[in-house]
């Protein structure tokens, strides 16, 4: 029989503070409301989040779902006590995976797990999630905050995100008809994004630099620059898809780099020929390669190396698609082309060299 009365145990004695959780909910409500969009009212507190597809303007939609995390980039956030941008990363990693299938992100849910809940820290994280949702045009309709003493040490926490989008039936990507000679457009990344951070942290450890030290590759501290949020490509890509009808395939360059991600959207008889001379890697990648002695091939299969997204388009439409994307604020360049692929050959081949 459990103890009761004034000397009995409480949930708080076990390390779970329900009042702290309630305080965090009150702090995040304005951020959640800021993500309101057609189909979602921007309120939280129910047992489940609601979304009205008809109110969002869809007639015969196919739903597309994705989930992801931020990986060990979170360790930098924790060590540097900088929590206001990892939520943007969380949203970006999910919604960029939706748009590559031609889907408009509609709603997002998050999972935040920690050993000891700090309401201000949690609110900062959710503020970043809300900022990412606004940028992607999706509503934050719910989430879970789990305080789990004994599961996480110190100030450690983890995040997971879940996004659902939709496309009208028949408008999903990749589309058919990818052909030899099609052009591959590259869209510049904002930096390292959210992949390869275990290697990043290893290199920083070897360098002996503290997180608050001036970054050797740009203006700001090492933590600030390495915490640059993942770019969200949703609205520019949706504009280009709808305005041109010319995009045949998109690939989000995440873990595994070019060789693991581009072939996922290609037919087996075609390969992507990437012109490495066309890439202008941000200075952070040169610093990582030189400081860690990381070979170019390893860089290409670990990091985005300056290209966060690629689009496959007909050669005659490349300039028009690039112009639409540039008009929406993207840095776009011709990255390569589609070539015939021999049996057993890799789906990504390179020419030129990466300027690291």
UniProtKB/Swiss-Prot annotation:
Gene3D superfamilies registered for this protein in UniProt: PurM-like C-terminal domain, PurM-like, N-terminal domain
Keyword Transit peptide attached: no
This protein's GO CC annotations: cytosol
Gene Ontology MF: a single term: phosphoribosylformylglycinamidine cyclo-ligase activity
SS bond partners: none
Pfam families, alphabetized: AIRS, AIRS_C
GO biological process: 'de novo' IMP biosynthetic process; adenine biosynthetic process
Highest taxon in the source lineage: Bacteria
Biological pathway: Purine metabolism; IMP biosynthesis via de novo pathway; 5-amino-1-(5-phospho-D-ribosyl)imidazole from N(2)-formyl-N(1)-(5-phospho-D-ribosyl)glycinamide: step 2/2
Subcellular location: Cytoplasm
Coiled coil: none
Keywords: ATP-binding, Cytoplasm, Ligase, Nucleotide-binding, Purine biosynthesis
Family assignment from sequence similarity: Belongs to the AIR synthase family.
Annotated PANTHER family: TRIFUNCTIONAL PURINE BIOSYNTHETIC PROTEIN ADENOSINE-3, TRIFUNCTIONAL PURINE BIOSYNTHETIC PROTEIN ADENOSINE-3-RELATED
Protein name: Phosphoribosylformylglycinamidine cyclo-ligase
